[in-house]
Amino acid sequence: MKTLLVLALLLLSVSVQAKVYDRCEFARILKKSGMDGYRGVSLANWVCLAKWESNFNTKATNYNPGSQSTDYGIFQINSRYWCNDGKTPKAVNACHISCKVLLDDDLSQDIECAKRVVRDPQGIKAWVAWKAHCQNKDVSQYIRGCKL
């Protein structure tokens, strides 16, 4: 019984660890997922966005006191509009997902939700970090040297 408890605790600790992607590894995943050029957004812009939003950390969260919402995951997807965290007032959940899935190592739902975000009229400008650090900048450095 004690062995099972130790094993369960070990598995739990493994499941809550963050995955921090290397920028080239992240770029390859995005490319395979059809993000390069999606809605006119280059691969380098997506990588720049994730660098400044989460530093490629799948477990990144950021609470926004003004809207009482939280940004989740590698793309910092907001609980007010895009996912359900069960605590954000007047949440829309336009991606129809739990915010928890944005914190795991599987990026498929993060990517699908990011695609949903850029389909809105605001597009990639929905991300404040993209506007501050990537818009109208040479973002080629974010994929330079990556074997894509």
Curated annotation (Swiss-Prot):
It comes from the Eukaryota. Keywords: Antimicrobial, Bacteriolytic enzyme, Digestion, Disulfide bond, Glycosidase, Hydrolase, Secreted, Signal. It catalyses: Hydrolysis of (1->4)-beta-linkages between N-acetylmuramic acid and N-acetyl-D-glucosamine residues in a peptidoglycan and between N-acetyl-D-glucosamine residues in chitodextrins. GO terms for molecular function: lysozyme activity. The keyword Secreted applies. GO terms for biological process: defense response to Gram-negative bacterium; defense response to Gram-positive bacterium; digestion; killing of cells of another organism. GO terms for cellular component: extracellular region. Lysozyme C is capable of both hydrolysis and transglycosylation; it also shows a slight esterase activity. It acts rapidly on both peptide-substituted and unsubstituted peptidoglycan, and slowly on chitin oligosaccharides. Monomer. Lysozymes have primarily a bacteriolytic function; those in tissues and body fluids are associated with the monocyte-macrophage system and enhance the activity of immunoagents. This is Lysozyme C-3.
